[in-house]
């Protein structure tokens, strides 16, 4: 196991951890259906930027 040679101060530890915080995912509203989806992702019904890009199975 690695063992530190010199103890890190609270300040140095906190500076290292400053980028570790989590943020909520950003959601967008689909233009055609008004459904929420992750930004830059295809919505569950196959639309992206208001256009149908993925063929989805119909419930027949």
Swiss-Prot record:
Listed Polar residues bias regions: 22-31
Key words, A-Z: Ribonucleoprotein, Ribosomal protein
GO biological process, one term: translation
InterPro entries: Ribosomal_bL32, Ribosomal_bL32_bact, Ribosomal_zn-bd
Span list, region Disordered: 1-60
Entry-linked NCBIfam families: rpmF_bact (TIGR01031)
Protein name in UniProt: Large ribosomal subunit protein bL32
Organism: Francisella tularensis subsp. tularensis (strain SCHU S4 / Schu 4)
Name of the encoding gene: rpmF
